[in-house]
Amino acid sequence: MEARAQSGNGSQPLLQTPRDGGRQRGEPDPRDALTQQVHVLSLDQIRAIRNTNEYTEGPTVVPRPGLKPAPRPSTQHKHERLHGLPEHRQPPRLQHSQVHSSARAPLSRSISTVSSGSRSSTRTSTSSSSSEQRLLGSSFSSGPVADGIIRVQPKSELKPGELKPLSKEDLGLHAYRCEDCGKCKCKECTYPRPLPSDWICDKQCLCSAQNVIDYGTCVCCVKGLFYHCSNDDGDNCADNPCSCSQSHCCTRWSAMGVMSLFLPCLWCYLPAKGCLKLCQGCYDRVNRPGCRCKNSNTVCCKVPTVPPRNFEKPT
């Protein structure tokens, strides 16, 4: 029992030796003081080092040449506040001068590096913004750039083909005239003008007058029936069911008479067809520029050549 008590009593100095480390029991550890001072700093004190955002993209004012920029406040007051605050919050047991000097040295170094970094970043940002404003000011102040603004849509130049004079073939195209009416007898001028078929929906929908009559008088049903009942591939009865010159004329008219009992609108087909012929003749008479005479003599008219004018001053 005594041996165990002695071994237990002898183990206490062995456990206490690494904790003492050759110092007295009343002397504090400087590392504990440093960690305590670092934990004392709050977020408000750390943010006070840089209280403005220097990397904004907002509009900046061009500095005037007569005015000097206001000096930035020094960070001495911040250092004093940062240094003075931990001293008030120190526990009473840390009152030795060596502990204070060893704890303040790394903290002051970190603050000085942060403040110097903020100064250098401020200088670079202000210098870059001032250089940009100088470039912008010189570009906007230039007079020829403002005067060279295009305000009118430029017109395309005339094509070389438009500037060429009419050739002899173009001049002699309408040289053949009618002896009676005096109008041109070329193929282009004497071709009959049909009624327009794309006059609906801004010339996008195809709707001719013949199709309107076919669908309005139900003749489209008769054409479909004749198309399916015809055995001959060359038979055109379906295209013109009321024709008297084609084959099976009696059969077609008899079938149309029977269908008119169920479709009374078929009785309006022949009057509508006559109105269409009348409208076609009136439209052709108004819009055809050439000759409409059947038997007339053709006269060749020479196109007079105009000599060039001499732009000379009168004497």
UniProtKB/Swiss-Prot annotation:
Residues 1-39, 51-140 are annotated as: Disordered. The record marks P144, V145 as: Cleavage. Residues 178-315 are annotated as: Required for interaction with TESK1. Its main location: cytoplasm. One of its GO terms (cellular component) is cytosol. Pfam families: Sprouty. Residues 20-32 have a biased composition (Basic and acidic residues). Residues 177-291 form the SPR domain. Cleaved at Pro-144 by the prolyl endopeptidase FAP (seprase) activity (in vitro). Residues 1-15 have a biased composition (Polar residues). The Cys-rich domain is responsible for the localization of the protein to the membrane ruffles. This is Protein sprouty homolog 2.
